[in-house]
């Protein structure tokens, strides 16, 4: 989408004011104008009006933003306008995502050594070749769906796995710093659904607005074969016994939906061990809040990084316990996949050597190897078809095929829904299933994150991936006046664009000008972050509903996401962020900033989304029974994080894997 010559001139001047030329190229020197035009043409045509507003504000500002006044004065005026500030941030993201800028900040993706990239081939079946009937249809191919599909296929049943997303190559997911789930640039990633075909509605402070997959509030994870496990950080934490009984341990705060799980840690422990062995977890050390594992982890931890060594010594001085972060990443060769190459592009990216365990290189190949599993991609389950007695008899499928809408109903004996905590309730609601007591979609939660950032006098970053290496679990529970708590760990190796965003958001470096550029050169390798998720107390008013007026490209009502963060969650976030700062200061940080408090007035939804189809023992207060079976529908199961009554103060994927193993085990033996 081409700009006018006048707009190009304004944009080039703005880019060079924001990131000027010194001993290194300016933003305009590295193609800022072409970058913005490419974004408007290929990524976000809906941004054209905002770019026009920003450039018009530049042209008409009085006193002028562009002109002879001192640069500092002009920068201050420039950032006072929200549209100009937004455009400047986008320009900075483009600049620091370009390999041209990386030597300037001392960043490289291969600090841990070179590697030979590989691809995992999967047999994706054309839609025209689908059978009329399968014993089981599994909807979603992520952690829950992929795991369930393997167990069910290996039991001798025929399985169809339906995935809305495509199967992009590893190379296509391994290196783009702008277009990945961790980028803040707002550009669609290859793991996103079609931005224009899948809107959602986000309600904030009572005001509804239509949002697209790259936007905040949409609640994106990853729409691709393998789901979020293609590009996740792979932290493999267990929930601990207290996590399964939060209401009993702490009581129920006013306005919250805090409740106990219908199963205990002891019931899930064998499946935790099975998941750790089956999918491959590396790590070491003991979490003080759960007993020793019944089976030792199959791989030792990855060697600690330089930041981890500093944090370990600091924790010892503070009297805190630490452990190696458990990871679904091979530290050595395991099950035919190599050990980690220690690259600096891990979370948000596909693993170039397939050392990171994902459904695409574990469960799905195993399921397909039975000869009983069929995988179809770029196809959406639009409705579950019911017959007598609440039994589901089939699944309606829909897709775009050669530019036309394709529809097909596949018959089945059983259905497993594992489409994520936004799309799973949406499918049930669109199907009229499971909502007799208005429970489907309620208790939506994810993870509020706590943390702090520190700057050190000397360089502390060695850029050795994945980066996350050491954690303290001392504060998961047992904190006076706090409900639950969380885990704190060092952070994944950040990209230069992420580093810019972290430092500017914290107010530790200027956003623009020569001072900003020089600070990026000096501080990028002197920065360390300690972060972690907190245990949310949930709310019945945080929920997924069907929007009454907005539909997707197939005419189906989209998800309407509303709700808020409970005040207790903000108290816990502040408590844990203070602990993160203490840790950094003890490690030698000379300047620190804690994470800003999360905005309370919108629902918690994101990569760790959970809770929207919680399991329980009473149909009046849950969507499924303790075995994941939807109340009133004996052959419909849920097998993703939607089931979680609470979501722990740690990354939830290992619990999703373990619970999916448990549910599929029950299904195959029922």
Language model features: what each stretch is:
Residues 324-328, 339-346, 382-385, 525-536, ...:
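A glycine-rich dinucleotide-binding beta-alpha-beta segment and adjacent secondary-structure elements
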Residues 166-191, 222-235:
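Conserved N-terminal glycine-rich FAD pyrophosphate-binding loop of Rossmann-like flavoproteins
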Residues 646-665:
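A conserved FAD-binding loop/helix module that cradles the flavin
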Residues 133-161:
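N-terminal Rossmann-like FAD-binding beta1-loop-alpha1 element of flavoenzymes
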Residues 185, 192-201, 211-215, 235, ...:
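Conserved redox-cofactor binding core of oxidoreductases
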């Amino acid at each position: 989408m081409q700009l006018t010559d006048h707009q190009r001139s304004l944009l080039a001047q703005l880019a060079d004011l924001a990131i000027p030329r010194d001993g290194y190229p300016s933003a305009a020197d590295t193609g800022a104008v072409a970058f913005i035009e490419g974004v408007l043409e290929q990524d976000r045509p809906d941004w054209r009006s905002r770019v026009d507003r920003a450039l018009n504000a530049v042209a008409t500002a009085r006193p002028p933003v562009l002109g002879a006044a001192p640069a500092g004065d002009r920068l201050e005026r420039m950032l006072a306008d929200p549209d100009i500030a937004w455009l400047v941030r986008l320009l900075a993201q483009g600049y620091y995502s370009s390999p041209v800028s990386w030597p300037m900040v001392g960043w490289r993706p291969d600090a841990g050594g070179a590697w030979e990239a590989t691809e995992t081939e999967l047999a994706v079946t054309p839609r025209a070749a689908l059978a009329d009937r399968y014993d089981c249809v599994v909807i979603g191919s992520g952690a829950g769906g992929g795991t369930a599909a393997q167990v069910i296929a290996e039991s001798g049943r025929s399985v169809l796995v339906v995935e809305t997303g495509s199967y992009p190559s590893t190379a296509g997911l391994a290196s783009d710093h702008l277009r990945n789930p961790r980028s803040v640039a707002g550009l669609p990633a290859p793991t996103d659904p079609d931005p224009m075909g899948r809107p959602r509605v986000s309600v904030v402070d009572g005001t509804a607005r239509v949002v697209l997959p790259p936007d905040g509030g949409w609640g994106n994870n990853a729409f691709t074969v393998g789901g979020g496990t293609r590009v996740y950080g792979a932290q493999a934490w267990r929930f601990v016994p207290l996590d399964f009984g939060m209401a009993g341990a702490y009581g129920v705060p006013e306005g919250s939906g805090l409740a106990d799980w219908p199963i205990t840690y002891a019931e899930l422990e064998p499946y935790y061990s099975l998941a750790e062995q089956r999918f491959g977890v590396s790590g070491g050390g003991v979490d003080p809040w759960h007993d020793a594992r019944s089976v030792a982890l199959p791989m030792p931890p990855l060697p600690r990084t330089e930041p981890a060594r500093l944090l370990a010594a600091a924790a010892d001085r503070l009297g805190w316990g630490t452990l190696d972060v458990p990871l679904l990443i091979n530290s050595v060769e395991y099950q035919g996949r190599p050990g980690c190459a220690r690259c600096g592009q891990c979370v948000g990216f596909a693993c170039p050597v397939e050392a990171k365990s994902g459904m695409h290189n574990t469960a799905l190949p195993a399921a397909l190897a039975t000869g009983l599993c069929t995988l179809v991609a770029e196809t959406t389950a639009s409705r579950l078809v019911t017959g007598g007695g609440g039994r589901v008899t089939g699944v309606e499928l829909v897709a775009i095929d050669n530019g036309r809408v394709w529809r097909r109903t596949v018959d089945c004996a059983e259905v497993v829904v594992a489409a994520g905590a936004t799309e799973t309730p949406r499918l049930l609601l669109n199907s009229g299933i499971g909502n007799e007591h208005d429970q489907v979609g309620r208790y939506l939660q994810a993870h509020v994150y706590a943390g702090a950032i520190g700057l050190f006098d000397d360089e502390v970053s060695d850029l050795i991936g994945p980066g996350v290496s050491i954690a303290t679990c001392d504060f998961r529970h047992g904190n006076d006046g706090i409900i639950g708590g969380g885990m704190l760990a060092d952070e994944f190796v950040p990209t230069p664009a992420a580093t810019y965003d972290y430092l500017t958001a914290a107010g530790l470096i200027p956003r623009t000008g020569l001072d900003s550029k020089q600070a990026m050169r000096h501080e990028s390798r002197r920065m360390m972050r300690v972060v972690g998720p907190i245990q949310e107390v949930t709310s019945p008013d945080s929920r997924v509903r069907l929007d009454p007026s907005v539909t997707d490209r197939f005419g189906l009502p989209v998800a309407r996401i509303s709700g808020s963060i409970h005040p207790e969650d903000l108290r816990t976030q502040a408590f844990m962020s203070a602990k993160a700062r203490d840790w950094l200061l003890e490690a030698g940080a000379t300047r620190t900033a804690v994470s800003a408090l999360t905005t309370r007035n919108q629902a918690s939804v994101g990569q760790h989304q959970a809770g929207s189809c919680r399991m329980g023992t009473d149909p009046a207060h849950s969507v499924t029974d303790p075995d994941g079976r939807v109340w009133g529908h004996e052959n419909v199961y849920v097998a993703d994080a939607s089931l979680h009554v609470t979501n722990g103060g740690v990354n939830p994927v290992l619990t999703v894997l373990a619970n999916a193993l448990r549910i599929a085990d029950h299904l195959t033996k029922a």
